Structure formats: C-alpha cells, structure tokens
Regions:
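Noncatalytic alpha-helical scaffold of FAD-dependent oxidoreductases
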Residues: 1-233
Length: 233
C-alpha cells in the first residue's frame, strides 16, 4: 500500500486530513478466511475503522477508493503573522485559538526562520478568479521554492518585519512548492546539497517541474466545489 499512497499523493498533502485512512472512502480487503469484501463507513464500519494500523492482522488491503479533487481555479488566501520571541509566539498561538471550528480556515502552520523567528501561516482555501496580488501564476517561467519566497519576500532580510502580510497563491502551486511533494523533499535531502548552493540548479528544476503534473487531495476545497469531485480506485 505504500506505493499506492505515494502514487495517489494523498499521504500528507493536508495538515487536516492527510493520512490515507482519513482520505479513503472504501477498502477492498481479503480477510483471513480468504473472503474478499468491500468495507465502507456505512458497511462493516467497525472493521473499516480498525483497518488503519492493523498491520494486515485483519486482512490484506488490495485496493482503496479515495476522493480526488481538480485544483484548477482554487487559491490559498494566506495571512502571515510574525513572532520575534517565545513570548510573542505564545501570545500568537493563544490568539489563534479563536480560529478553531472556522470552516474557512484550511490550516494554521508555524515556520521558523534561522531557528529564532516564527512565521505563522493562516491559510484559507478559496474558489475565485486569479487575484491581482497572486505571487505564483502558471504563465511565469520561473517559480521559487515556497520557503525561499517566505524567507526573502515575505519577511525582511533582518527578520524583524513582514514585507507581505497577506497574499493569494494558486493552490496547486502552494501544495507543490511548499507541501511534501517531490520538489520539497528533494531540496531538503542532505544528499542533494547542490540544489541549495547552486542557483542554476534551482533555476533548472524550477523550470522543468510543473505543479499540473502532481495531483493533490485537499478536503478543504471539496467542501465548496462538489461538482469537481470524483472517486478513483
């Protein structure tokens, strides 16, 4: 199932509903008595909920039905907040509790810059025409790594001020440049150190890799666009 998880690209694409068992709609399982059956939330729900983490002790999962979503036309409206010390970070975390239960908010994340500064990302999934303040657009021939954009364009060089407090980024670009897609993993791999040190390598890979080649699952957008959903097995 590891190959299927990676192939569908649903293992970690959402901070909210990222794991395969949170994404799956049905399992086709061969039980220990060699009987093949389909498990869903509505049918055999007790066994369905036991499958994740059972390590094949219940049965062998041979197929999974998942929900996929077309990302065209979806954007992430991102608000940035900067905390310069631990006290400010704790105050920011406390203030973010008011966002709990807000269906508009897809995720809240904290990234650290140079081990000291903390940038909070409050991401809201939207379905709109291309905003005028978009950072990434598909007609641009060069795209930054997201964290490069964050550390150089969003936060000032001295790390003490936000240069951009709010922006919109095309969802497939946000997921592809920031989330655990191939681009992010390759760049963070110590064995691929040359990607960090040579600008022409970032240029080369940034030009060659396109977000349209990577299908991503995002439950937050599925709440607003039912017509774009389908199931794949």
């Amino acid at each position: 199932m590891g190959g299927a998880i990676q192939g569908f690209g649903v293992e970690s694409t959402s901070m909210e509903h990222g794991f395969l068992h949170s994404t799956a709609r049905a399992y086709r399982v061969v039980l220990l008595n060699e009987e093949a059956t389909v498990l869903t939330v509505d049918r055999e729900h007790e066994i369905f909920n036991v499958i994740p983490g059972s390590f094949n002790t219940v049965g062998l999962v041979v197929a999974v039905q998942v929900e996929l979503l077309l990302l065209d036309g979806h954007w992430m409206d991102i608000e940035y907040r900067l905390a310069l010390d631990r006290a400010a970070m704790l105050r920011t975390v406390h203030s973010l509790h008011s966002l709990r239960g807000d269906d508009r908010v897809d995720s809240v994340e904290c990234l650290r810059i140079d081990g000291a500064d903390n940038v909070f990302l409050i991401a809201i999934g939207t379905v709109v025409a291309a905003p005028s303040a978009a950072v990434f657009s598909m007609d641009r021939w060069w795209h930054h790594f997201y964290h490069f954009h964050l550390f150089h364009d969003v936060v000032g060089g001295d790390g003490t001020a936000l240069l951009i407090e709010r922006e919109s980024i095309e969802l497939k670009q946000f997921l592809f440049r920031h989330d655990r897609g191939a681009f992010w993993v390759i760049h963070d791999d110590p064995a691929m150190w040359f990607l960090r040190h040579f600008g022409f390598m970032r240029f080369l890979f940034g030009h060659m890799l396109a977000a349209e080649d990577l299908y991503r699952f995002r439950r937050g957008c599925a709440r607003s666009v039912d017509a774009s959903r389908w199931s794949a097995q």
